[in-house]
Amino acid sequence: MEKLKLGYLKEFCNRTMTCPKEIARIIEENEHKIRSCYSESFDISREDFVKMVLKDSTFIIELFLRADKKEKYKNDYLLSNPLLNRHILEDLILLENQLPFFILEELHEKFSKRHSENSLFIDLSRNYFYSCIKSIPKVMEKEKGKKKEVKHFTDLIRYFHCPTKHKDFGDSIRDLSTATQLYETGVIFKLDEVGGLLDIQFNKWYPTEICPCFTCSWLLNCLPCLKCFQCLERTQPLLKIPQFEIDDITEGLFRNIMAWEQCYYPSEAYLCNYMGLLDYLLDTGEDVELLVEKDIIVNSLGSNEAISKMVNRLCLEIVEENSCYSELAQKLNKHFDQCCNRNMGLLKSTYFSNLWRGIATIFGLIIFGFSLWSIIRPYVV
């Protein structure tokens, strides 16, 4: 790895037509500021510290510049090696490995800015992480060209996942039914293709609050083609969730971001709140399977059970002061606690789960009606 870093340092100097001493001078000027960004002191000399930051910072910037033009550098040793590229990504998101973001920005601004289509280092970083981390919402593409003050890459990736609009925080979630339990009470899980990862919404038509029989879920279950009529779909209790692709780096990524949030954003722990909500919804493999069927979860990890265990592990040592999903949880609990919703859900799943069962149920009711009429008719006429 050391040899690779030295090679990238040489390439960076060739690209920017500068020398390592000139880059080192900028780092020396900021040495005290860089050291102050770490909670622990470095017991190394000034010269060794500057060399370390020089190699790491130029390696990262050169990597991002090459990744931004993959076609040109498709034969690059690192970019053409998926396994090595994955290890580099894991190192970059590791909380204890972070370089202060400001020094990377300053070096890019002074030396490599003119050699990149992205004038801001944050945009260069966004392009790299967006291509590697599937959970970063596409909505973040709209944020290009905006400068944002971040401390390091873990903080930056958290920012990429955060909602574009501030969410209201309420009490922490104490109790919530699982995805399959909610589904049994008539809640329809739907993929939200527009919102960011954390933009989860529960919409329920007001008349169904008063009388659950006003829902058209049974009809839409039998005739899915009618879902194109918005007026019918609105009658269903809809839980809209954006897609979440889970792979083998997801656990490490979220563990680092959640640890960072617990220390520095305890009152705005968006990712901790999100994972806490999933911890309630995804209690078993069956819950995961339901969301996989709805295309809400893309399982690149393996078994559905592995995902539920991963989510449960991530939330083991998390302490929630509040939650941005407090109101959502209250609405879902209110829906679940109404016995009428459970009865309607049972009716739908038992008698109207598909077209043929729905037709059989209707014919059965018609025959039952005629039979009943034939019995009582002599006494009525």
Where in the sequence are the language-model features?
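Hydrophobic alpha-helical cores of multi-pass transmembrane domains in eukaryotic membrane proteins
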Residues: 362-372
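Membrane-lumen (extracellular) interface motif
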Residues: 372-381
